[in-house]
Amino acid sequence: MSNSLSNTVPPDLSAQPENPGEWPKSDFNCATIKALIDAFQRWLGEAFDSGIAAERLIEARTEFIDQLLQRLWVEYGFGSINDIALVAVGGYGRGELHPLSDIDLLILSRKKLPDEQAQKVGERLALLWDIKLEVGHSVRTLEECLLEGLSDLSVATNLIESRLLIGDVALFLELQKHIFSDGFWPSEKFFAAKVEEQNDRHQRYHGTSYNLEPDVKSSPGGLRDIHTLQWIARRHFGATSLDEMVGFGFLTEAERNELNECLHQLWRIRFALHLELNRYDNRLLFDRQFSVARRLRYEGESNQPIEHMMKDFFRVTRRVSELNQMLIQLFEEAILALTEDEKPRPIDDDFQLRGTLIDLRDDTLFIREPQAILRMFYTMVRNSSITGIYSTTVRHLRHARRHLTQPLCYIPEARTLFLSMLRHQGGLSRGLLPMHRHSVLWAYMPQWSHIVGQMQFDLFHAYTVDEHTIRVLLKLESFAKEETRSRHPLWLELWPRLTHPELILIAALFHDIAKGAGGDHSILGAQDVLKFAELHGLNCAQTQLVAWLVRHQLLMSVTAQRRDIQDPEVIKQFAEEVQTENRLHYLVCLTVADICATNENLWNSWKQSLLRELYFATEKQLRRGMQNTPDMRERVRHHQLQALALLRMENINEQALHQIWNRCRANYFVRHTPNQLAWHARNLLKHDLSKPMILLSSHATRGGTEIFIWSPDRPYLFAAVSAELDRRNLSVHDAQIFTTRDGMAMDTFIVLEPDGSPLSADRTQMIRVGLEQTLSQRSWQPPAPRRQAAKLRHFSVPTEVNFLPTHTDRKSFLELIALDQPGLLARVGQVFADLGISLHGARITTIGERVEDLFIIATADRRALNNELQQEVQQRLTEALNPNDKG
């Protein structure tokens, strides 16, 4: 696995700045200290930019602060006091001071300090804050240190890393003797606590470093994972460096070199990040990634510097994670010792069990027979009691991986084993997932290497391409489990209908395999999967299905979210693309898994309702036949009769009902369900129809809260309502805009809270009052523009306005792609009203920082827009959505 920084420019080492960090022998006042600190911080940036290694600069800052604190200690008279010492702890104790790292100090005394000395310590610490040093400190006696350390793991860890700066050497050595004694956090207890702490930390980051805004220090595979190894080794073995761990036999020299390389690469990124910030933080947030990448000399156009940097970062964290898990196991064996149950038990001629971990019986097997690597993972799939790979076997696997002469998929037995894994229940979670974690998926199929660590610079994708793909596979596997029913009932019913589930898994493996390769990744991925299918012996029908799924992976998602799926013609066109119910079953399962695995917040009841609606409508169309589409009048009658049946149960006035319905146009009945029609009618019959009425559904309708508005129609009504909903922080996902024959607006909005849930009950009255005030206003006043969300300011989405082909001359379909921004719908509505254009429907889709909306519009006389008006709309919308000042 290559980890060279191939997209960086080497620095010019010919003119490195001179270190200003020499403390004056006299004139040691606050202003002098602050000036020298500022000069030193500037030098750190200049030195880093000139090519001096981060580890040298970290060492230089540590030494610089050491000298300052030692000088201050003497200057203020502490040097002559016995039984007191100044001790560096935490990261400072390790000697790991980045530009913005906290300076953690312990003022250690044998007995409680007299009030006068305690006051003097407080005054001197205040001076450090005055000169803008981020100092964390504690003042403790030896006894207090030990008591605090025994009760608090973080205090104990800080003490284990302690380093004497100046003061009573004997006192410090006494502290060291106590904290490394068996009575102070015995090795077994410390090891177990640190492993639990690491597991908890990993869980906070969803178990992966592959979140696209990772924490360089705390994400899985980050610096903390290396620190954890160092802490455990320090406590148990007394090892103060990776070199000493080699001496104890717990690291090979190659592993030591690899960990050092990873450590220095992570230091380099963290150092550059700190130079770009004013306040301590270790998160590579989107708005920082470009400047950090440039500082690290990554090159390329547009977002390429970011993608190259993050790819290097993610590949480093992958290596750290694997080494961390392997060494944790080795520590466990050494510290906790094997129990009788953990003695090896044979599985077959090749493998044995140590506890619940699979282990090699012959250390040379993977080198002699590379296909045995796949045999091991298939054994893990077939035996659900195996929870992982034994540490020494991981070491042999890593060694064999580096000595492979060809991809594993070129070995016939390996191909057979790989397909067997895909066909086996649990084959993904127990086989492909660990293969991915140990870089064997990369070794098996060469295409996988291109997407490992591949990020996309947007707010839509939460994970790298490889991590997303693995999550798609795991989501698909979950459709076979009964516990998934509450969240995905339909897909659970469909899964058993897939005649060859392994085919959808192959399609999932390849659906994003060509991301970042240039060109349409769906087309390129379909070409790649054809080669895979041929190599693995799939028959013609199976090959065609997986290639079709990869090629059309976005078809259902785009149709459901960005097309008018209540239009029979749209359903017919979609059904013509799908062709068979079998394809439909595969496609809907892949689509749902893809959405769920893209971003944890992306899947909601609204998207589920859209996909269900499209699925059932397409299923009906396929069973009916392509030549038969439902007649509009037939659909109107059907919906009216079903709604009437519901209303008759309540003894409504049918004559009054028909008077209301006679005012409505046919589209109103087609685009609402019978339940919606009955709900509207039930309330309209009790209402003075000359006055506005606002209804908010108490139960989710089509996955969201339905807001129904009855009001005299007027220009800018849609813009005004949209502005009010935006002001209330509601997301509009669908709008149906109707006008009765006598000029009353009957508008329906499906809205969700920002977290994707229906409107919370405690907000209903507030929303209703706000809308009532909006309807009472006679004229339209555009709202004052709100500031754009901070995250969005770092993204750019060119506004695109496209008119889609249509089968009718009575309406136009406008597709809008733009940067998400406050008040977008209101601005769109204002443009339509300015141009005298009627809005009949809207489908609103927000994908991260990007909106992809569909608007159904017509002229005032209910005709499609001509070319001239289309051009005017394009120009006005582009101007409205690209203001010079984004706030």
Swiss-Prot record:
Belongs to the GlnD family. SUPFAM superfamilies: ACT-like (SSF55021), HD-domain/PDEase-like (SSF109604), Nucleotidyltransferase (SSF81301), Nucleotidyltransferase substrate binding subunit/domain (SSF81593), Poly A polymerase C-terminal region-like (SSF81891). Residues 706-786, 813-887 form the ACT domain. GO terms for biological process: nitrogen fixation; regulation of nitrogen utilization. Residues 465-587 form the HD domain. Residues 347-705 are annotated as: Uridylyl-removing. NCBIfam families: PRK01759.1 (NF002487), PRK05007.1 (NF003448), UTase_glnD (TIGR01693). It comes from Klebsiella oxytoca. Modifies, by uridylylation and deuridylylation, the PII regulatory proteins (GlnB and homologs), in response to the nitrogen status of the cell that GlnD senses through the glutamine level. Under low glutamine levels, catalyzes the conversion of the PII proteins and UTP to PII-UMP and PPi, while under higher glutamine levels, GlnD hydrolyzes PII-UMP to PII and UMP (deuridylylation). Thus, controls uridylylation state and activity of the PII proteins, and plays an important role in the regulation of nitrogen fixation and metabolism. Keywords: Hydrolase, Magnesium, Multifunctional enzyme, Nitrogen fixation, Nucleotidyltransferase, Repeat, Transferase. This is Bifunctional uridylyltransferase/uridylyl-removing enzyme. The gene is glnD. It catalyses: [protein-PII]-L-tyrosine + UTP = [protein-PII]-uridylyl-L-tyrosine + diphosphate; [protein-PII]-uridylyl-L-tyrosine + H2O = [protein-PII]-L-tyrosine + UMP + H(+). Pfam families: ACT, GlnD_UR_UTase, HD, NTP_transf_2. Residues 1-24 are annotated as: Disordered. Its cofactor is Mg(2+). Its EC number is 2.7.7.59, 3.1.4.-. Disruption phenotype: Cells lacking this gene are unable to uridylylate PII and are altered in adenylation/deadenylation of glutamine synthetase. InterPro entries: ACT-like_dom_sf, ACT_dom, HD/PDEase_dom, HD_domain, NT_sf, PII_UdlTrfase/GS_AdlTrfase, Polymerase_NTP_transf_dom, UTase/UR. The keyword Nucleotidyltransferase applies. Uridylyltransferase (UTase) activity is inhibited by glutamine, while glutamine activates uridylyl-removing (UR) activity. PROSITE patterns: ACT, HD.
